[in-house]
Regions:
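Conserved N-terminal entry element of GNAT/NAT acetyltransferase domains
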Residues: 1-31, 39-42, 181-202
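Conserved GNAT-fold acetyl-CoA-binding loop/helix
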Residues: 41-66
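A short helix-loop-beta-strand connector motif used in the catalytic cores of GNAT acetyltransferases and
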Residues: 64-80, 110
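Conserved beta-strand in the GNAT
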Residues: 80, 86-95, 110, 115
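Glycine-rich acyl-CoA binding loop
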Residues: 81, 122-130
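A conserved beta-turn-beta hairpin within the catalytic core of GNAT-like acetyltransferases
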Residues: 98-111, 121, 143, 168-169
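Active-site acidic-Proline motif in GNAT/NAT acetyltransferases
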Residues: 117-119, 123, 151-152
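Conserved active-site alpha-helix within GNAT-family acetyltransferase domains
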Residues: 127, 131, 139, 143, ...
Length: 202
C-alpha cells in the first residue's frame, strides 16, 4: 500500500470494509489497474453494449495514456482500494474548469472510471471508493459530479441511483453510413411512427 497511496483515513460517515485500505493511486502505479480495467470491459462486453467495444490490446494502452494525462494536471485524481496489499478496486475523477452551459460550481467533475475486482463485487468496495471520492471533492469545495453509464449496465445504474443520482443527459450514438444511403434508420434504431415524426426537431 505504501508505494501506491497515502492511505488517508475515511471521513466521518463514510463507509469502511474490514481489511480494505483506500488511498491515493498515482500515475506511477497504473499498471496495477490493468486487470481491473479489463474486468470492467469484459462486464460491458458480456452485457452486449450498444456500441462495439475496442479490443483489450488497444483499449488499455489508450485508457492508460488518458489516466496519465489526467493525473499530471493537478486537479484530477485517482483512488485505489487494497486488500492485503493487492489492488481490488479503483476510481478516477476528472476535475475540469466549469462548464459553459450547465452550472457546476467552480469546477466540472466527472467520474470517468469505477471498477472492482469480480471476486470482490457485492462486498461494498464500490461504496467505500465512491465515499472516499466524495470526501475528497467536498474537501475541495466541490459538491456535485456526473457519471456516464453504458445503457446496458443496469447494475451500475442502480448503484448510482441508490446514491441519489438521476438522469441529467443522454448521449445518443448513431451510424451515418447506411442511414443516409437508403433513408432508413440505423441498425437498432426504433421505428418511426407518425406521432414521433410529428415531434421531431427537423
Amino acid at each position: 500500500m505504501s508505494a501506491a497511496g497515502t492511505g488517508e483515513g475515511a471521513a466521518a460517515g463514510s463507509a469502511t470494509v474490514e481489511g480494505v485500505v483506500v488511498g491515493s493511486l498515482d500515475a506511477g502505479h497504473l499498471d496495477d489497474v490493468e486487470p481491473l480495467w479489463r474486468a470492467l470491459i469484459d462486464h460491458l462486453r458480456e452485457s452486449d453494449s450498444v456500441v462495439e467495444l475496442v479490443p483489450h490490446e488497444l483499449s488499455w494502452p489508450r485508457r492508460r495514456a488518458m489516466y496519465e494525462e489526467m493525473l499530471v494536471d493537478g486537479d484530477s485524481f485517482a483512488l485505489g482500494a487494497w486488500r492485503d496489499g493487492r489492488l481490488i478496486g479503483y476510481a478516477v475523477m476528472r476535475v475540469m474548469p466549469p462548464d459553459p452551459v450547465w452550472y457546476t460550481g467552480t469546477h466540472f467533475a466527472e467520474l470517468t472510471s469505477l471498477s472492482v475486482a469480480p471476486e470482490e463485487r457485492g462486498a461494498g468496495i464500490g461504496t467505500v471508493l465512491l465515499d472516499a471520492v466524495e470526501d475528497r471533492l467536498l474537501a475541495r469545495g466541490l459538491d456535485q459530479y456526473c457519471i456516464g453509464v453504458d445503457t446496458v449496465n443496469d447494475g451500475a445504474r442502480r448503484f448510482y441511483e441508490r446514491r441519489g443520482f438521476r438522469d441529467g443527459f443522454h448521449l445518443l450514438h448513431g451510424w451515418i453510413a447506411g442511414r443516409r444511403a437508403v433513408g432508413a434508420p440505423a441498425p437498432g434504431a426504433p421505428p418511426e411512427t407518425p406521432e414521433t415524426a410529428a415531434h421531431g426537431e427537423d
